[in-house]
Curated annotation (Swiss-Prot):
Belongs to the archaeal DnaG primase family. The gene is dnaG. It comes from Nanoarchaeum equitans (strain Kin4-M). It is an enzyme of class 2 (transferase). Mg(2+) 1 binds at residues 179, 221. InterPro entries: DnaG_primase, Primase_DnaG_arc, TOPRIM_DnaG/twinkle, TOPRIM_dom. This is DNA primase DnaG. Its cofactor is Mg(2+). It comes from the Archaea.
């Protein structure tokens, strides 16, 4: 917060001075009192005004430059504007400090109340914005919280892992498998009650066992993380019959009823989904570039980063991977695991690795994908 003179003061006189000699603070103050005495009568005598509390302490800041003394003075007053102006003008008449010639010039008279009003105006704006941000509800967020609270009551806990599930997951011959609790809540909200959440990418044993007894449609987000979820499910021995995908860039938990139904209606057999993935990678015009970059790091225990033209920018040993700069992509001589991913998350758009067991936000391409 800005500092102001005591509340009784209305104005602050600010002046500069230049003295042709070496003097001290006491000499300067003495000259101001002495040479203004009697100029404006007893009513505006500086000493009398100080005794009455209408004039504050004269503050002097100065320094010596060669054989001269230069600096500034500030004088707070509680007088009216006219009287303050007279005193300011009187100070400019001081032409000597001791035996040395002096020149005083008033720079400005600060209206303390105006400064306070400006501070109040600006601070009030800040406080008003803070107040609105705290008191004005985010309707969308409130809606989600209320829906979460309401529809969560309809969920059950499934299996020894107590997975979030719709009330018909055990009775139905077909189930919809999703990643997390928020996905389950959203589907239940829209009337899909045979849904089961996995609570992450570590595949629960209950999910694998249930997939052996029921037809399973895996419903994944519209990003590349879904590919890893599927890979982990298959690696864990789960039987997946169909795959449904949310619209590009969308998450299952945020889909509308229409979007959910459309995605589920467009589900495809697992074999076709895997085939489509292979075609997508094979048709990538940069496939050979990916191979080349992975071959450069293969068996080197290093990581390299590259730009959008696949020019190598920097490389470091894997133990120093967190020291590499942000760039378009990174290629690493190892399997992408959670520990490594934590060090590079958010720094690259593309990650090339020998293999991966991470649900990464970025695009991840492995040796299997490009062979």
């Amino acid at each position: 917060m800005a500092k102001f003179a005591p509340v009784q003061y209305k104005y602050i006189i600010k002046a500069e001075f230049e003295i042709d000699g070496i003097v001290d603070r006491e000499d300067i103050i003495g000259a101001i009192f002495g040479q203004t005495e009697g100029l404006l009568g007893m009513e505006l005598d500086l000493r009398e005004l100080q005794k009455q509390g209408k004039l504050g302490r004269i503050e002097v800041e100065y320094k010596r430059v060669g054989n001269k003394t230069i600096g500034t003075i500030t004088i707070p007053t509680s007088l009216k504007a006219v009287e303050t102006s007279l005193i300011a003008a009187a100070i400019e008449t001081v032409d000597r400090v001791g035996p040395a010639k002096a020149r005083f010039r008033v720079k400005e008279i600060v209206d303390v109340r105006s400064s306070k009003r400006e501070y109040i105006r600006n601070r009030a704006k800040e406080l008003f914005v803070q107040l609105l941000s705290k008191t004005a509800p985010d309707i969308e967020e409130l809606r989600r919280e209320l829906e979460e609270a309401y529809y969560s009551k309809q969920l059950i806990e499934y299996g020894e892992e107590k997975l979030p599930a719709g009330p018909l997951v055990e009775k139905s011959d077909e189930i919809i498998l999703v990643e997390g609790r928020a996905d389950v809540v959203n589907l239940v909200k829209h009337g899909i009650l045979n849904v089961l959440g996995m609570n992450g990418i570590n595949i629960p044993k209950s999910v694998v066992e249930l997939s052996k007894r029921k037809k399973v449609t895996l419903f994944i987000d519209g990003d590349r993380g879904g590919e890893l979820v599927l890979r982990n499910l298959l690696a864990a021995g789960a039987d997946i019959d169909y795959v449904a995908v949310a619209p590009p860039g969308r998450e299952v938990e945020e889909l509308t009823n229409k979007e959910i139904l459309k995605a589920l209606k467009s589900k495809i057999p697992l074999e076709q989904y895997i085939k489509n993935l292979r075609i997508s990678i094979n048709n990538d015009e940069n496939k050979e570039k990916y191979k080349e970059l992975l071959s450069k790091v293969f068996d080197t225990k290093k990581a390299i980063v590259f730009d959008e033209q696949f020019n190598i920018i920097d490389e470091k040993p894997l133990e120093e991977i967190d020291k590499l700069p942000s760039a378009y992509g990174i290629a690493i001589d190892k399997i992408l695991d959670n520990e490594t991913y934590a060090k590079i998350k958010g720094k690259y758009q593309l990650i090339l690795a020998l293999d991966s067991n991470v649900n990464a936000q970025e695009r991840v391409i492995t040796l299997k994908d490009i062979q």
